[in-house]
């Protein structure tokens, strides 16, 4: 009888889908309830669409491996972005009708997640909400007090904790429904914070770390990650104790088995994944581990996949540098945290970096012209004022990295910097990402100036679109920092920070700045601006300040007619006629010389066109 009723109910669901969706959320939800399935939703709110959240995929994969096949539970992953409308995410979660919702929390999404935590209980009052991630692990008590409808927080490493929670929810269904012995059950689960029957927040001890090799590979369905960055983990923990960083808290450094790593990297190579970003905090902290992986990707290079690593440059040895120098241009890119060149600051934040060694190694890698190097500085660190930061900037800028990122101190809960904030006189924002406003050594006014300089560096250096012009312009100033400081002041003066600008607009502002800063030599910069402009693209809307192209139509026609026959410069254009070659290249007369820009063949590091001087 029960079976017949269930079948009839299912038929009613199929025949009356609209009515069921209106009254119960959706058809799938009703079907699951009839089958007595607990639906678990792991939600990630990413900063951008191209990002993926490794954490939620690892939680799901580990739980399924640990618990085995379980017909009474279904785990689904939903990834959103902070750029989506709030209502769109709210509605999507409601339609999925989860019994248990787990949300991955970070600096960049915690404000957004906070709004979800306020509204979701109103529309899904019976849903259990669990949070996890670095943003909630070290301040669980305050968060649970702020959001009374949140069931609990998974603190620290989450795979084993999440699996145990699912086991408990599955085995103790009746107990949880009746509300009996809940405190007793939760008290035995390591790595969680929860609210007991009296409303008091209980923080259990952190859970011992797991064997990293036990975490399943999560990218079998690689098609789900098309056009997105793949994040990969070959180690967890960090051997260092930088006071501003949460990674220093996890002292249990462990590595995934190298043979397993190779097998998984080969999967990415076979599938020609564009980029794999290692999330290891210091990838090269163990030389044999780094060497084996770098050797493997070098020997199995598919000519397409790029691998991104965060490294300590001063730890690189000659053997590693030699191997790196032999790699295909663009095979790897290195992110190197310098943070400061002030030795007092470096010591105070517990870094072991030797700036002289770091500079030498960055230079050695630079000479290979095959690796994109991304160097970081942090403004707002102890004992680093405005003048000192300017010196740190000049020191790092002189290393000529492909990217120089100016960041601002984030005072993270759980970090040593958070504990010492009062001692350092650090004033920071209450809202995430808890960015510095001022310190004993740096005023808020100076922070504003540094933010303006940061934008100038981003536009005129990191874009790689003004390299010839900026290299020459630097000689007009006492230092690179002064140059960007002056350019920022000019932007401020003409109110250019208040509006957005096109690429051509940035060139025009820079030209105006040149005419004001070095009037007698401004015209000398036109050639450099022209070169920079056409290195990246065959610009159709030519800026007025460049004047007319010195190459006439007849000269261009004669060149391409000859090139079609002889292939003197465009050797890789076999099969292309002169009309096609003309579309894919550009001829320009710069400083009296005829220059050919080839957009089919670009530098793998900079993206700039190949350039030939036409004789």
Where in this protein do the model-derived segments appear?
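Radical SAM enzyme core and accessory elements
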Residues: 5, 9, 17-25, 31-43, ...
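A structural motif corresponding to the C-terminal lobe/cap of the Radical SAM core domain
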Residues: 45, 287, 299-302, 306-315, ...
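Short N-terminal binding/cap micro-motifs at the start of the first secondary-structure element
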Residues: 49-55
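Glycine-rich beta-alpha loop elements in corrinoid/cobalamin-binding modules
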Residues: 39, 55, 62-64, 74-206
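N-terminal [4Fe-4S]-dependent radical SAM core
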Residues: 38-40, 186-234, 606-611
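Radical SAM [4Fe-4S] cluster-binding motif and immediate context
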Residues: 1, 213-367
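Proline-aspartate-enriched helix->loop->beta-strand connector
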Residues: 97-101, 273, 401-402
């Amino acid at each position: 009888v029960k079976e017949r009723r269930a079948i009839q109910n299912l038929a009613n669901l199929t025949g009356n889908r609209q009515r069921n969706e209106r009254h119960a959320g959706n058809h799938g939800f009703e079907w699951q309830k009839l089958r007595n399935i607990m639906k678990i939703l792991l939600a990630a709110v990413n900063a951008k669409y191209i990002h993926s959240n490794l954490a939620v995929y690892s939680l799901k994969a580990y739980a399924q491996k640990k618990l085995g096949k379980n017909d009474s539970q279904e785990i689904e992953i939903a990834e959103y972005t902070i750029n989506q409308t709030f209502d769109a995410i709210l509605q999507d979660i409601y339609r999925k009708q989860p019994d248990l919702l787990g949300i991955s929390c970070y600096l960049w999404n915690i404000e957004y997640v906070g709004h979800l935590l306020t509204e979701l209980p109103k529309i899904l009052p019976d849903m259990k909400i669990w949070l996890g991630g670095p943003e909630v692990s070290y301040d669980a008590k305050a968060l649970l007090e702020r959001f009374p409808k949140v069931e609990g927080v998974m603190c620290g490493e989450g795979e084993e904790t999440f699996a145990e929670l699912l086991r408990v929810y599955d085995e103790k269904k009746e107990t949880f429904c009746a509300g009996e012995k809940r405190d007793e059950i939760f008290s035995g689960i390591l790595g969680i914070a929860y609210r007991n029957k009296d409303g008091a927040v209980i923080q259990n001890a952190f859970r011992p770390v797991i064997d990293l090799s036990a975490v399943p590979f999560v990218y079998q369905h690689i098609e789900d990650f098309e056009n997105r960055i793949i994040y990969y983990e070959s180690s967890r923990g960090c051997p260092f104790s930088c006071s501003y960083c949460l990674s220093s808290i996890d002292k249990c450094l462990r590595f995934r088995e190298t043979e397993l790593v190779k097998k998984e990297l080969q999967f990415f190579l076979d599938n020609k994944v564009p980029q794999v970003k290692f999330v290891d905090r210091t990838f090269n902290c163990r030389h044999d581990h780094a060497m084996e992986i770098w050797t493997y990707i070098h020997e199995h290079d598919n000519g397409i996949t790029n691998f991104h690593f965060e490294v300590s440059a001063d730890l690189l040895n000659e053997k590693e540098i030699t191997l790196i120098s032999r790699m295909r241009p663009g095979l790897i890119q290195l992110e190197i945290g310098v943070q400061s060149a002030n030795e007092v600051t470096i010591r105070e934040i517990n870094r072991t970096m030797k700036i002289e060694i770091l500079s030498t190694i960055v230079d050695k890698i630079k000479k290979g012209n095959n690796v994109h190097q991304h160097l970081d500085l942090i403004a707002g660190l102890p004992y680093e004022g405005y003048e000192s930061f300017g010196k740190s900037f000049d020191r790092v800028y002189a290393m000529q990295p492909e990217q120089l990122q100016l960041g601002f101190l984030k005072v993270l809960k759980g970090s040593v910097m958070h504990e010492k904030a009062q001692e350092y006189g650090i004033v920071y924002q209450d809202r995430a990402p808890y960015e510095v406003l001022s310190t004993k050594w740096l005023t808020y006014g100076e922070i504003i100036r540094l933010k303006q300089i940061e934008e100038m560096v981003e536009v005129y250096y990191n874009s790689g679109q003004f390299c010839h012009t900026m290299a020459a312009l630097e000689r007009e100033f006492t230092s690179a920092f002064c140059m960007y400081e002056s350019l920022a002041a000019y932007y401020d003066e003409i109110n250019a920070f208040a509006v957005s600008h096109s690429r051509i607009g940035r060139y025009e502002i820079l030209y105006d700045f040149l005419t004001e800063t070095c009037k007698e030599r401004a015209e000398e910069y036109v050639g450099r601006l022209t070169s920079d402009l056409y290195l990246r693209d065959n610009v159709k809307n030519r800026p007025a300040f460049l004047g007319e192209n010195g190459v006439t139509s007849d000269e261009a026609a004669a060149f391409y007619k000859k090139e079609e026959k002889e292939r003197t410069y465009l050797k890789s254009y076999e099969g292309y006629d002169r009309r096609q070659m003309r579309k894919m290249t550009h001829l320009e007369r710069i400083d009296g010389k005829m220059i050919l820009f080839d957009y089919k063949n670009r530098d793998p590091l900079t993206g700039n066109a190949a350039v030939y001087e036409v004789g």
